[in-house]
Design a protein with these regions (language model features):
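C-terminal, surface-exposed recognition/capping segments
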Residues: 406-537
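Sec-type signal peptide cleavage vicinity
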Residues: 2-397, 402-405, 409-411, 417, ...
Length: 537
């Protein structure tokens, strides 16, 4: 992810500042936004019980924003509130019915006893006393901020009397922070996909409720349910609309006009995990691409440009082996050769090819060396660095395995999802290559196997660095690709002591993980790969 920050002031010339990441733009204040009392303009309402709050053409702090120009607009249904002489929070009697650059609000109440008054913008869903940054936000078109009012945007100001005029002026200051997501990709597979939502999780609350204190006028904060996560939906639910499927991902570089998505969050220092939900409408596969951002101070009245390269992790097709074979399962018939018909390596679940090793004259055939009751470890280079059976048991039984049903990845030219998070060996207490968790060396005295359940809760943001991810890469049986996206089997370097047909392997699915040798036929085309390739380092 590109990590630069630019700060723009809309009341001054462009300034830039290189810092950690993102782009920050400060919302300009409404320095020329006036409150006019008892207007004498014959075209205006002269009702003595109403005060006119004028939002003029020159103002730049309205409630929606044009990213490129910095212009702001009042939106349909935007009301303001003003605390009057009696200390009552008064709601304007009118609001725009469309997107406008200027609007004249009418507010009931008394505004004669003071030279200043407190002004509030509390969003569109307010009860008149509070506003909440929503945990579910929705944007129906790219580069559009009309949803700010329902997402929890709010602002405050002090209106002060203009000397020599029967008017009040105020500067509206927006209080939340704003994230502007701009995903892009050079992956041609993803170019045919759509962004359907952006899910942001934090190590602390990023959604909150703010209530106007009737005594002090301050906005008192209180927590909301599930305030550590906000989900922004990025599609138009109207059937047949241009954004019905979501926002396009056709851009090779950041483009706010192509898929810019805006989220309102509570200001503060947050460590964020951003999950971009991407859908291939042709195959109906929908999943996530995850980015984790370091702790950063997100300031109020500021927006941050969150550019993200969505180049998903790609896994090769070259690490499937029969147990301890000299060459990989499809050596000479690799999918990259694009052989005709079913000659070469199958790349889709359920497809088969007859060109797999079928006897020990083939270098792709398994090692069939065996002596009853004697430990036998793999001897070929491709198996030298993979975990032995003891280590596999530590991962399965003590690695706190957690299934991730949504993280996207590619292999052999196709998009898949599904995999498991396991603790890195550094964070597994007692981890040993010489003994399993039960204290026994399974290389010399092993049994059939052991299983463990799998959690469906992802590692927390604070702990995610302690885990690595194994994709559900499936396996090959008799030349056919099985269960890719649903399960995976990884060979250990240890053979079964009691049956010449078997070797130990780790296997997992969405509900279970286990290590065993029963049904671990050496002729299976399981994955043989060191776990450091997947981030266990």
């Amino acid at each position: 992810m590109k990590k630069t920050m630019k700060q723009h002031s809309f009341t001054a010339r462009l300034k830039s500042l290189a810092v950690v990441f993102g782009i920050a733009m400060v919302f300009a204040s409404c320095a020329n936004e006036d409150v006019a009392q008892n207007s004498t303009n014959p075209n205006e309402d002269n009702d003595k019980n109403l005060t006119t709050f004028v939002a003029g053409d020159e103002t730049k702090t309205r409630t929606s924003m044009d990213y490129n120009s910095g212009n702001f607009y009042w939106e349909d249904g935007d009301y303001i509130y003003v605390k009057d002489d009696d200390g009552v929070l008064r709601k304007s009697t009118n609001a725009p019915d469309q997107k406008v650059a200027a609007f004249k609000y009418k507010v009931p109440g008394k505004f004669a006893a003071s030279s200043s008054y407190k002004v509030y913008y509390l969003g569109k869903n307010s009860d008149g006393t509070s506003v909440s940054i929503s945990t579910t936000q929705s944007q129906t078109a790219p580069d559009n901020t009309a949803h700010f009012g329902t997402a929890g945007d709010y602002g405050t100001a002090t209106a002060t009397k203009v000397t020599g005029k029967n008017q009040f002026k105020f500067e509206l200051e927006h209080q939340p922070a704003y994230l502007v997501f701009q995903p892009y990709t050079s992956n041609t597979i993803l170019h045919n996909c759509y962004l359907t939502k952006v899910e942001v999780s934090s190590d602390n609350d990023i959604a909150e409720k703010y209530t106007v204190n009737p005594t002090t006028g301050a906005l008192d904060a209180s927590t909301v349910t599930n305030g550590k996560q906000i989900v922004l939906t990025t599609r138009d639910p109207t059937w047949g609309s241009s954004n019905y499927n979501g926002f396009p991902l056709t851009n090779n570089s950041a483009s706010v006009t192509t898929n810019g998505a805006y989220m309102v969050i509570k200001p503060g220092t947050h460590t964020l995990r951003v999950r971009y939900w991407v859908k291939d409408v042709a195959t109906n596969v929908e999943g996530t691409i995850t980015k984790t951002l370091p702790a950063t101070a997100y300031a109020s009245n500021t927006y941050y440009d969150m550019t993200a390269n969505l180049n998903v992790k790609d896994y090769d097709g070259d690490h499937y082996y029969m147990w301890d074979a000299q060459q990989q399962y499809w050596y000479g018939y690799e999918w990259t050769k694009h052989l005709p018909g079913n000659t070469g390596q199958p790349t889709l679940r359920g497809y088969t090819s007859p060109n797999y090793a079928q006897n020990n004259t083939d270098s792709r055939y398994y090692n069939d060396a065996y002596t009853y009751g004697i430990a036998h470890s793999a001897t070929h280079a491709s198996f030298n660095s993979i975990p032995n059976v003891n280590e596999m048991l530590w991962y399965a039984l003590k690695g706190d395995p957690r299934w991730d049903n949504d993280e996207l990845w590619t292999t052999m030219g196709h998009l898949y999802k599904g995999g498991i998070w396991i603790k890195k060996k550094t964070y597994i207490n007692g981890y040993s290559a010489n003994k399993a968790p039960d204290g026994i060396d399974w290389q010399t005295n092993g049994s059939i196997g052991q299983n463990a359940s799998v959690s469906r809760v992802l590692p927390s943001i604070a702990d995610i660095g302690n885990y690595f991810y194994l994709p559900a890469l499936g396996s090959y049986t008799s030349g056919g690709l099985n269960l890719i996206g649903f399960s995976a089997s990884f060979w250990s370097s240890s053979a079964d002591l009691w049956d010449r047909r078997y070797a130990y392997y780790l296997t997992f699915s969405s509900h279970q993980i286990g290590v065993g040798c029963n049904y671990g036929y050496r002729y299976l085309g399981n994955r043989a790969q060191k776990f450091s390739d997947f981030g266990d380092n």
